[in-house]
């Protein structure tokens, strides 16, 4: 899933509009992605992008992780998420979408780089990335605790 999301981000981050779903499916299939992964990813992404139009929900600033989240997200990943919230890069709602995306990576070993990519994808898809100058460079090239 993350490979497909990164591909979409890299292909369409500068575009005003991405192609429709059918065109995306064909393009992703031609790029070598499996149909089941394409459909699951595009379904998750459609939910994410449709939520951007809704009123922001009130989420708690601090989060307690469910047992399955604790199992999937190691200490480094949870610290990265906490750091991004503390640095005001992720608001609580975006944090929930990042966690949702990470949990959808079922079976993968999730690392802090996955958290950073998912953060970029969530902020980009929700139209929030423009609020942060050089966010892509900062997120992908920082050492924990050195993002300023």
Swiss-Prot record:
User: Which InterPro entries does the record match to this protein?
Assistant: Smg (IPR007456)
Against Pfam families, the record matches this protein to: DUF494
**Assigned protein family:** Belongs to the Smg family.
Q: Which PANTHER family match?
A: PROTEIN SMG
Q: What is this protein called?
A: Protein Smg homolog
- Whose protein is this, by species? Thiobacillus denitrificans (strain ATCC 25259 / T1)
- What is the gene name? smg
